[in-house]
């Protein structure tokens, strides 16, 4: 996911300050996720759950989702509307898919990430965390498509 982000950053970087900030927020979210799941350079084994890493990831996650829905998507839809009806229609479809994706992530958050972790639900938590990663990957693909759609036209 970081490679995909790097590619997009190189593609649109510097052309729009809002998009640049958004992509930087995505990078922070990914780093927080990787830290939480134990993906670190030069690390040999997974460690026990780091509560601070969980808190950091959850905060980054909620901030990222909020920024997308309450600031960026609306601006991108407005930008799409200035180009053409077809572009607006495609962007609106992506926006609906992103809303559904947000709902999935928030369900994971409410059911697994926001609750205390103990030995009884550790495996369930790890599975939920993996699902969140997969859902984030889907989200980033949708967002990348929206960015490219709007900024290629």
Swiss-Prot record:
Its main location: cytoplasm. It is found in: Cytoplasm. Keywords: Cytoplasm, Transcription, Transcription regulation. Binds RpoD and negatively regulates RpoD-mediated transcription activation by preventing the interaction between the primary sigma factor RpoD with the catalytic core of the RNA polymerase and with promoter DNA. May be involved in replacement of the RNA polymerase sigma subunit from RpoD to RpoS during the transition from exponential growth to the stationary phase. One of its GO terms (biological process) is regulation of DNA-templated transcription. It comes from the Bacteria. Belongs to the Rsd/AlgQ family. The keyword Transcription applies. Interacts with RpoD. It holds the Pfam family Rsd_AlgQ. GO terms for cellular component: cytoplasm. InterPro entries: Rsd/AlgQ_sf, Sigma70_reg_Rsd, Sigma70_reg_Rsd_AlgQ. This is Regulator of sigma D. Transmembrane segments: none annotated. The gene is rsd.
């Amino acid at each position: 996911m970081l490679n995909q982000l790097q590619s997009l950053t190189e593609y649109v970087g510097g052309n729009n300050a809002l998009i640049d900030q958004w992509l930087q927020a995505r990078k922070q979210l990914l780093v927080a996720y990787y830290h939480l799941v134990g993906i670190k350079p030069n690390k040999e084994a997974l460690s026990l759950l780091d509560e601070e890493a969980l808190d950091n990831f959850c905060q980054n996650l909620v901030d990222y989702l909020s920024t997308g829905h309450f600031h960026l998507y609306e601006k991108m839809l407005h930008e799409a509307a200035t180009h053409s009806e077809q572009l607006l229609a495609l962007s609106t479809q992506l926006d609906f898919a992103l809303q559904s994706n947000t709902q999935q992530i928030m369900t994971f958050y409410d059911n697994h990430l926001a609750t205390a972790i103990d030995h009884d639900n550790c495996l369930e938590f790890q599975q939920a965390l993996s699902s969140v990663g997969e859902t984030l990957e889907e989200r980033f693909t949708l967002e990348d498509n929206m960015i490219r759609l709007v900024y290629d036209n």
